[in-house]
Swiss-Prot record:
Protein name as it appears in the record: Peptidyl-tRNA hydrolase
EC assignment: 3.1.1.29
Keywords, sorted A to Z: Cytoplasm, Hydrolase, RNA-binding, tRNA-binding
Described purpose of this protein according to its UniProt entry: Hydrolyzes ribosome-free peptidyl-tRNAs (with 1 or more amino acids incorporated), which drop off the ribosome during protein synthesis, or as a result of ribosome stalling.
Quaternary assembly: Monomer.
Catalytic activity entry: an N-acyl-L-alpha-aminoacyl-tRNA + H2O = an N-acyl-L-amino acid + a tRNA + H(+)
Length: 183
């Protein structure tokens, strides 16, 4: 069985350590558990792609190169190319509605205002995929726009705390792969 893990984020070094790219960072961390596997640029599928074989089947990781708000274009291209069922897709996305460090696994969920999730749902014509929502919290100050916040760099405290988030993400990812998760 083939599974697809979609990391939501923006391509480019300037975005690497931003809250909106926590999906990319999480995918990189998950992939480290499979030694010797790296992302390769795949222009025809609008993504960087890595494939791993696990005891549960093939897992394809993608980091779309379309920017967050257009993630659906890449997801649909990869889904169709590899003939992956929608319910075998897991999307790793930042979540401003969860406190920093909280990780939540859900299926057939709404987007919570996330434009990348909205793009994926529109492109697939369904929300029957799984979401691993990675809490990044909200701005502490009212004068900070939400868009500036998610495109902002992690604080030193968040950079330290992100490791715990990745540990929780690995546990939920493993459950999802094995089919033992609960929505």
């Amino acid at each position: 069985m083939t599974m697809l893990v979609v990391a939501i984020g923006n391509p480019g070094r300037q975005y690497t350590w931003t809250r909106h790219n926590i999906g990319f960072l999480c995918a990189d961390r998950l992939l480290q558990e499979f030694s010797g596997v790296h992302f390769k640029e795949t222009p025809k599928l609008f993504s960087d792609i890595a494939k791993v074989e696990s005891s549960q089947g093939t897992v394809i990781f993608i980091k779309p190169r379309t920017y967050v708000n257009l993630s659906g274009k890449a997801v649909l291209a990869v889904k169709e190319y590899y003939n992956i069922a929608t319910d075998r897709i897991l999307v790793l996305a930042d979540d401003v509605n969860q406190p920093f460090g909280k990780v939540r696994l859900r299926q057939s969920a709404g987007g919570g205002g996330h434009k990348g999730i909205k793009s994926i749902t529109q492109s697939l014509g369904s929300n029957d995929y799984w979401q691993l929502r990675l809490g990044v919290g909200r701005p502490q100050r009212e004068d900070v726009e939400l868009s500036d916040f998610v495109l902002g760099q992690f604080t030193e405290e968040e950079q330290i705390g992100i490791q715990s988030l990745f540990i929780e993400a690995w546990a939920l990812f493993s459950q999802w792969c094995s089919g033992t998760q609960t929505a």
